[in-house]
């Protein structure tokens, strides 16, 4: 938790979920400050894209902005920081990146996302609603503004210029000129080797153009013939849960992720590949397993992320492991795949009191931890 002066006011801002070990990481950056220096002469409907922890929404709450994000955790972070600063949450309208945008905004502020495909999807959505009078400004660390970034703005929206760097941040200014643009598919699709399935990914889903090598390894070692409920935690495009659905015909599968596009991709992949099994599925956008009742699942399958936006972190994995222990039935099992260097074995041993190595190769390890009653 720290204080930031934004738009002439002092705000207390915190990363989310709160994590004492990462207090050195700020919930805002120079790119936020730089953006806010540009907006005081613009009135009207304001759209904010990819506001990681709500710094922009807090500073501009009096405008009643619309905050658009694929990340549910970013929405939770924004709500948390609004409350911490005594700002009514209802002053900001939240929507995900797949929902239609409001028409004719006066001001569009974009924090350039890590995934260029997500930026393209958002710019294409903006193309449908902006006007030549709309002020469009994007910002990022200077090192993250590439020629390819500028070319995307130019191709989709129109005339694009960039600013000088300030505190290692850079702005992108864009004027909508409606350049000719070929249509693009709504999802990326590819065949999953060894199956009749075609996998469909929305723009912000990890490994959208093919199966990542960690998931490929994990697919070879999933449990079979289970009953009860299985969770695909951090489901991404749902390929792990899809295979679990096929291998466990007497079980149901929950697909859950903090990315709206991930959960939408998972639903689409079940609908397209195993439509007769959709009744055995649940799809949930969530912060890990928050709010899920204890002692529910027979098994949880997890490939934890170790990045939050641009920061490397292990607190998301810790949260997933602890949530999994709470949500598993006694005797239930958590299966985890991860890079060997992340040392998940030690973390799982600490969280569960036990851990078994299922398989390993030169890069990845698959681990299993069982929920057991603690010895008195």
Curated annotation (Swiss-Prot):
Tell where it localizes. Cytoplasm
Enzyme Commission numbers on file: 2.1.1.174
The record lists the catalysed reaction(s) as: guanosine(1835) in 23S rRNA + S-adenosyl-L-methionine = N(2)-methylguanosine(1835) in 23S rRNA + S-adenosyl-L-homocysteine + H(+)
| Any single Gene Ontology cellular-component annotation | cytoplasm
Among CDD domains, the record links this protein to: AdoMet_MTases
Q: What's the main place this protein lives?
A: cytoplasm
Q: Which HAMAP family match?
A: 23SrRNA_methyltr_G (MF_01859)
Question: This protein is called what?
Answer: Ribosomal RNA large subunit methyltransferase G
Task: Give the species this sequence originates from.
Answer: Klebsiella pneumoniae (strain 342)
| Taxonomic lineage | Bacteria, Pseudomonadati, Pseudomonadota, Gammaproteobacteria, Enterobacterales
